[in-house]
């Protein structure tokens, strides 16, 4: 469907809207830290907005609207990949809630930031490859590399947060 000229504008708009939202999130975080405007509400709402943006993007791209005539996904995504991404977000959000409820801030770490950046590149890249870019082999290979890199970094990020939370979880489970 994406090759039809009447749909190309949708691909352009969707990818640019996602990029503007992702860059806006980065700029807002930078300004909040730079001007010492970090609040408890912001520590909750910013990760929530990140989840909506990223998980929403991946879930939508997994939808049946992005299947070919045989019912195969044209996005390069598989259901298990999106489950890994969404599952990681739910797990880390739960750990963040647990930590914040205990009075301990739960800031993003290096792997969490790398994950957000790569996911924020992967979603619009996938969107752009729904149009004429499908005919350019290196763009499709780059899409697949980005998808697999996203999955790898998502898992590494989950493991890093679990490792950092291990002591607090063990302490809480004992008493």
Can you annotate each of these PLM segments?
Residues 1-175:
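Alpha-helical transmembrane bundles and membrane-interface segments of multipass inner-membrane proteins
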């Amino acid at each position: 469907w994406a090759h039809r000229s009447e749909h190309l504008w949708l691909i352009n708009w969707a990818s640019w809207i996602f990029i503007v939202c992702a860059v806006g999130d980065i700029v807002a975080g930078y300004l909040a830290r730079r001007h010492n405007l970090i609040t408890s509400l912001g520590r909750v709402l910013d990760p929530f907005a990140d989840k909506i943006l990223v998980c929403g993007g991946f879930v939508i791209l997994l939808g049946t609207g992005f299947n070919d005539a045989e019912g195969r996904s044209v996005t390069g995504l598989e259901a298990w990949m999106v489950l890994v991404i969404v599952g990681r977000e739910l797990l880390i959000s739960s750990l963040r809630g647990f930590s914040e409820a205990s009075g301990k801030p739960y800031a993003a770490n290096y792997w969490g930031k790398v994950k957000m950046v790569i996911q924020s590149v992967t979603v619009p890249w996938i969107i752009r490859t729904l149009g004429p870019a499908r005919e350019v082999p290196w763009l499709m290979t780059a899409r697949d590399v980005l998808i697999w890199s996203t999955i790898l970094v998502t898992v590494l990020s989950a493991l890093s947060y679990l490792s950092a939370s291990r002591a607090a979880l063990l302490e809480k489970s004992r008493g």
